[in-house]
Design a protein with these regions (language model features):
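Second-shell residues forming the walls of enzyme active-site clefts
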Residues: 1-17, 31-33, 99-268
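Active-site-adjacent structural elements in enzyme catalytic domains
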Residues: 2-14, 18-21, 52-70
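Short, conserved acidic/polar surface loops in the N-terminal third of protein domains
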Residues: 33-38, 88-89
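A charged helix-plus-loop insertion that forms the helical arch/lid used to bind
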Residues: 39-52, 96-98
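Divalent metal-dependent hydrolysis catalytic cores, especially in the metallo-beta-lactamase
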Residues: 74-79, 235, 239
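Short, conserved phosphate-binding/catalytic loop or strand-edge motifs used
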Residues: 81-91
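Mid-to-C-terminal alpha-helical segments outside catalytic/metal-binding sites
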Residues: 261-288
Length: 298
């Protein structure tokens, strides 16, 4: 059923745009598993790291990538490279590979490589880091109020490693980082963080995606549509609205109007389109038929 749905979606999108669609999923493994039990599901990040063998993480990533691609899903919004450094964190916990940047970087590298070898795009999240919060950005707007040198040592280190390991995309966090941007907007909506830090200082040239703009960190404090426009102005390529079709339409209309009026920079939007099309070309180069496995029904 899922395979048929994804195939139908691709046919529709190709007929309308001439390009393949990104079909995304949150399939981290463990606590964040979206596929049914009849599919291949792997343990979560902390459990994989507990094996002490990064090759296990690679194999889990490759299995996950192959399973997703065989079903028609081509972009996995994983792994989390957040460092689990706050015991009071309500949302990361076992989704993290560990409580040190080195551990997270070591095991995330295998997952990033495995997912891509399995035939899907992946990303590192939640930039600049969701590990040291005591609040959940699904419900409210957290703040990580620590100096830049501490952010460099703890939060940013796994992202720098993921970039060096060739991660094709990075997802931003709806979190305030006053040491990086004191203007009162979360990372997703911050040009200083997305364009200045991630693109500039860290030299990341891949795709930047937002976390879902319907999360309360954005919706409650800024409004989802305003948040979408701010994220695009900040340098985010793919702005995610994961739940409400009507809201997606409103945001698309607002973005088109902002582009027409000059509130969105046309050159920057064209550069985003180029990055998106380059990523889709990379996916198209992977022969999906070679990844199809024949497994007996459950």
């Amino acid at each position: 059923q899922l395979r048929t749905l994804c195939a139908d979606l691709q046919t529709l999108i190709r007929s309308e745009t001439g390009h393949d669609a990104f079909i995304m999923i949150d399939q981290e493994g463990g606590a964040v598993t979206r596929l049914p039990e009849s599919c291949i599901n792997v343990p979560g990040s902390m459990a994989l790291a507990a094996t002490g063998d990064p090759e296990t993480t690679y194999l889990a990533g490759k299995l996950t990538g192959e399973e997703l691609r065989s079903l028609g899903v081509n972009f996995n919004l994983a792994p989390s490279v957040d460092v689990n450094c706050n015991p009071a964190n309500p949302i990361i916990g076992v989704r993290s590979y560990g409580d040190t940047p080195a551990t997270v970087a070591k095991y995330a590298a295998g997952m990033i490589r495995g997912l891509q070898d399995g035939g899907v795009l992946c990303l590192a999240k939640h930039f600049p880091g969701h590990g040291d919060t005591s609040l959940d950005s699904h419900l409210t707007l957290p703040c990580v109020d620590k100096p830049r040198d501490e952010l460099e040592r703890m939060e940013l280190a796994p992202f720098r490693a993921a970039i060096a390991d060739g991660v094709p995309a990075i997802m931003t966090a709806h979190i305030l980082f006053p040491a990086l941007d004191d203007s009162g907007v979360p990372a997703t909506m911050s040009r200083r963080i997305v364009t200045g830090l991630l693109r500039g200082e860290m030299s990341f040239t891949g795709l930047v995606t937002s976390d879902c703009m319907e999360m309360q960190a954005v919706q409650k404090f800024f409004g989802s549509v305003n948040g979408v426009l701010a994220a695009m102005n900040a340098g985010v390529d793919l702005v995610l609205l994961s739940h409400t079709t009507l809201l997606s339409g409103e945001a698309a209309k607002a973005a088109a109007e902002a582009l027409q009026s000059g509130k969105l920079d046309r050159k920057e939007m064209e550069e985003s389109v180029d990055r998106i099309l380059a990523a889709k070309a990379k996916l198209a180069a992977v022969p999906a038929a070679a990844l199809m496995r024949s497994r007996p029904p459950p």
